[in-house]
């Protein structure tokens, strides 16, 4: 039969035994928690790894959603854009032209004085008073004109039609038979028609244009410009 002293020492032993059991239980729980955490980590890692290739596989397997009408509509869209661009440029040009003031120059002819005949841009006067070439030029200058000159076929034909049967002094002259013909303002004659003879002064005769001596008296023809320009905006 155990002694009372032995019975009194039992509780400490029991207490120690319980303490060891608790430590073992705690160690088992810690080990279990560690294994659980490791398993969870590996499971999560594996799940993540398995998701990555799966998502890539899904991306590779996803069909491209493109409308079959898109390629056909692209040229049409480009055409519309080009037409609109051209229209915008044309409208811009039209507006700029519209804003720019337009000045129109119109060439008109004034009425010739009384007894003068207008042809083209000149007025002609047939002086029926015979005189030499030099004095005939003086008479023309008194009327702010010169002995007649012609620069076009129209003017030439007019003079031929209206001269009648008489000879008329005109504005051609030269220094000698070897020199070129000039008008009274010393501008060169364009040789529209040849001038016959070897004299220094020209006149209009029945045979066309000829040269004669300046002191011989003849009728004369005067001419002066009648053109002016006016600007209308």
Curated annotation (Swiss-Prot):
Picking any one GO molecular function of the record gives: natural killer cell lectin-like receptor binding
Chain ranges sitting on the Extracellular side read 98-233
In terms of PROSITE patterns, this protein maps to: C_TYPE_LECTIN_2
Which residues get glycosylated? 132
Q: Which Gene3D superfamilies match?
A: Mannose-Binding Protein A, subunit A (3.10.100.10)
Highest taxon above the source species = Eukaryota
Q: Where is the C-type lectin domain?
A: 119-228
- SUPFAM superfamilies per UniProt: C-type lectin-like (SSF56436)
Q: Which UniProt keywords apply?
A: Cell membrane, Glycoprotein, Lectin, Membrane, Receptor, Signal-anchor, Transmembrane, Transmembrane helix
| Localization per record | Cell membrane
Q: Region labeled Disordered — which residues? A: 1-34
Which residues are listed as membrane-spanning? 77-97
Q: Which residues lie toward the Cytoplasmic compartment?
A: 1-76
Classification via InterPro entries: C-type_lectin-like, C-type_lectin-like/link_sf, C-type_lectin/matrix_domain, CTDL_fold, NKR-like_CTLD
Q: How does it sit in the membrane?
A: Single-pass type II membrane protein
Please name the Pfam families in this protein's record. Answer: Lectin_C (PF00059)
Tell me, what does this protein do in biology? Lectin-type cell surface receptor.
PANTHER family according to UniProt: C-TYPE LECTIN DOMAIN FAMILY 2 MEMBER D-RELATED (PTHR45710:SF19), C-TYPE LECTIN DOMAIN-CONTAINING PROTEIN 180 (PTHR45710)
Q: What is this protein called?
A: C-type lectin domain family 2 member D2
Q: Which species does the entry assign this protein to? A: Rattus norvegicus (Rat)
Lineage, top ranks: Eukaryota, Metazoa, Chordata, Craniata, Vertebrata
């Amino acid at each position: 039969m155990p002694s009372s002293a032995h019975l009194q020492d039992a509780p400490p032993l029991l207490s120690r035994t319980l303490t060891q059991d608790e430590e073992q239980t705690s160690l088992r729980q810690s080990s279990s928690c560690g294994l659980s955490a490791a398993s969870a980590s590996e499971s999560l890692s594996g799940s993540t790894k398995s998701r990555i290739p799966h998502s890539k596989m899904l991306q590779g397997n996803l069909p491209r959603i493109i409308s079959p009408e898109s390629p056909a509509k692209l040229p049409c869209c480009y055409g519309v854009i080009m037409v609109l661009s051209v229209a915008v440029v044309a409208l811009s040009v039209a507006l700029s032209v519209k804003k720019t003031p337009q000045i129109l120059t119109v060439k008109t002819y004034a009425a010739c004085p009384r007894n003068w005949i207008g042809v083209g841009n000149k007025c002609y006067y047939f002086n029926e008073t015979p005189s030499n070439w030099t004095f005939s030029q003086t008479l023309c200058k008194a009327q702010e004109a010169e002995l007649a000159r012609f620069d076009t076929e129209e003017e030439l034909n007019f003079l031929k039609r209206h001269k009648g049967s008489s000879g008329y002094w005109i504005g051609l002259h030269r220094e000698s038979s070897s020199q070129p013909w000039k008008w009274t303002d010393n501008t060169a004659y364009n040789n529209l028609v040849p001038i016959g003879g070897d004299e220094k002064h020209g006149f209009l005769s029945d045979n066309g244009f000829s040269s004669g001596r300046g002191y011989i008296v003849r009728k004369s023809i005067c001419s002066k410009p009648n053109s002016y320009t006016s600007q209308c905006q």
